[in-house]
A protein has these predicted regions:
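Acidic, Ser/Thr-rich low-complexity linear motifs
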Residues: 188-203
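TPR/TPR-like (Sel1-like) alpha-helical repeat modules
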Residues: 1-6, 167, 173-187, 216-223
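Amphipathic alpha-helical repeat scaffolds of TPR domains
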Residues: 9-37, 63-89, 117-132, 153-156, ...
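TPR-repeat structural position
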Residues: 48, 101, 137-138, 172, ...
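Amphipathic alpha-helical segments of tetratricopeptide repeats
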Residues: 60, 109-113, 145-150, 183-192
Length: 223
């Protein structure tokens, strides 16, 4: 971000706007000004809020730009990461955690309805799977999941992502298949790049674990 800020004069208007928005979340100044007690690996609620607020006008300004849409949706999701939906333990009823959940789902679905390109946009499909996997209707994300099965075969995490929906709708075979493909994609990536970072190892292990978990539910002992 510091480098981006230093060369903004050579960037397009869109690029400048995105750099400024990202600087509210990732710049050294923003990090230094954040409450140290809330920082977790550079992450904090106040920085996430600042970024989401900075992206809101850009979503309006660049209406129809699918990349901007994806960045805004992700910014909204990070306000309540993995807590977009609440489940009542007594009744099992699942409801949106807050209005931001409804907003980001509406934004994604508006994009899909407005543009055929959006329906195959990797980031939008990825985010839609995450947005609905713990919702009352994960099956609505099946078309997005199906896109990700083959859209970017070299990116292990995206190859794996359909299983986040498959598992909730009982498509165990499909979940197993896409995770095996994801493991193979990860292996190819490591062979080509030599990247063995601990963070990437976690993602690789997640795919292996998903294969075992889904095979267990499907009774596929040999898998």
């Amino acid at each position: 971000i510091q480098q981006g800020l230093s060369v903004m004069g050579h960037c397009s208007e869109l690029e400048q706007d995105l750099i400024r928005a990202l600087s509210t979340r990732h710049s050294a100044e923003a990090r230094d000004a954040a409450d140290p007690a809330s920082l977790n690996m550079g992450n904090s609620p106040e920085l996430n809020v600042a970024f989401a607020e900075a992206m809101a006008p850009l979503y309006e300004k660049y209406a129809g730009n699918l990349d901007v849409t994806a960045i805004y949706v992700e910014a909204l999701m990070n306000l309540k990461a993995w807590q977009l939906w609440d489940k009542n333990p007594a009744t099992g009823e699942i409801t949106p955690a807050d209005d931001n959940t409804l907003l980001l789902v509406d934004i994604l679905e508006d994009a899909f309805q407005s543009s055929d390109e959006a329906k195959v946009h990797p980031a939008l499909c990825h985010l839609y799977c995450h947005a609905l996997e713990l919702s009352p209707f994960p099956e609505k994300a099946l078309p997005a999941a199906d896109v990700l099965r083959t859209r970017m075969p070299g990116l292990g995490h995206l190859v794996h992502m359909p299983s986040h929906i498959d598992a909730w709708v009982g498509q165990w075979k499909e979940a197993i298949d896409c995770n095996i493909a994801a493991v193979e994609a990860d292996d190819r990536y490591v062979e080509i790049t030599g990247n063995e970072s601990q963070f990437y190892k976690f993602y690789r292990m997640h795919n292996h674990h998903f294969v075992v978990w889904c095979a267990m539910f499907d009774g596929q002992y040999e898998t």
